[in-house]
Every structure is written in C-alpha cells, then in structure tokens.
Amino acid sequence: MQRIREVAHRSIPKGGHAHLYGSYARGDAHQGSDWDILILLDKDNLEQTDFDQVSYPFILLGCDIGEEINPIMYTKKEWESYKITPFYENVTRDSINLV
C-alpha cells in the first residue's frame, strides 16, 4: 500500500484525487485479488497524456511488484454523473483516500 501511495503522490496532479476501492479497501482481499484505484482529475476532459502520466505509473508499479493494479480515471464532473449508480455508492462507502 505504501508504494501505491507514493505513486499516487508523484502522479496525481494538483486538484486531483486517488482512492483505493474494492477488496483491499474493504479488508477482504485474498491471494490473487487485484488493486482497484479510482483517479479523479480536476479538468474538463481527459487526454492521452493523462493516461500516460497519471494512470500508467500504477500499471508499471503492478508489474514491478507482481500485483495487478487496475486504475480507472474520470474527470470529477464525469464521476459526479455516476452518483445514482451502485458503483458510485460502493466506492464512496468503502474507499480509502490515497491522495
């Protein structure tokens, strides 16, 4: 978890946030569980450079440590549009703030 936090602090731009959600956040992960990371950026639209500079470092870390890390990324406005979904409720309820 510490290395994931370090990558989050290095990769997430000012105004952005990263949250761990899923089994690791709930404390019920088992061997083979993946790490689910929600990345929220404070901008109007995502660009290819956002994926290269923000989410890709998490994937590289996963390769480095032999774990599957699955970052998903939205703008804050996009994420707000998910408020009515069970996914939003689950992430909001169970997530751990990384940055």
Question: What does each of the following model-derived ranges do?
Answer:
Residues 1-19, 25-31, 42-99:
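Catalytic core of pol beta-like nucleotidyltransferases
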